[in-house]
C-alpha cells in the first residue's frame, strides 16, 4: 500500500520541483532520505527508569524500536561517565518515514499550543530541517495519564536537497506548516 504523502510527492511535488529549479533528470529533484527522532534523557544518570520510559514513548511515537545512545565522553560537572546511557534515537526510512511525516504535519503539529507554524530558519545549510518538540504529548499515541514527566524530542528531516531553498520548497510542497 502506497502512502498518500509518497503518492503526492511522486505525482505533484517532484514535477513542480523539476519545473521550478530546471532539473534535467528526475533523480536531481530533492526527496526525503530519512527522519531521525532523538530524545535526550539527561536525568537518566540518576534514575534509569526515566530512560526506559523515554524509550517506550519513542517506540510508540515512531512505530519501531529505538536504540539507546551512550555518552561519548565523561563530564564531571554532569556526573557523567563515558558509556552511560543518556538518551535514545530512532531512524525512519521508506514507508514509516512518510507515515510519520504525514502524522506530524496533519495530527501532531496542530495540537501544539499557540502554534503559528514552524520556523524557516532551522535549515542546516544543506537542505536538512531540524525541529524541536517541547512535549511528547502532542502525538496521539501517547496517553496523557501514563506520562510521569513531560519530555521533548528533536526531529531531523534529512533530504537530498543541495540548498536550504530547495529543502524549504520540498517540505512546504509536502504540507509542512511554515510560519509566514
From Swiss-Prot:
GO terms in the biological process aspect are: translation
GO MF entries: rRNA binding; structural constituent of ribosome; tRNA binding
UniProt cross-references to Pfam families, sorted A to Z: Ribosomal_L5, Ribosomal_L5_C
Entry GO terms, CC: ribonucleoprotein complex; ribosome
Q: Does the keyword Cell wall biogenesis/degradation apply?
A: no
**Alphabetic keyword roster:** Ribonucleoprotein, Ribosomal protein, RNA-binding, rRNA-binding, tRNA-binding
Keyword NAD annotated: no
**Entry-linked Gene3D superfamilies:** 3.30.1440.10
**Family, as annotated:** Belongs to the universal ribosomal protein uL5 family.
- This chain belongs to the protein called Large ribosomal subunit protein uL5
Q: Which organism is it from?
A: Oenococcus oeni (strain ATCC BAA-331 / PSU-1)
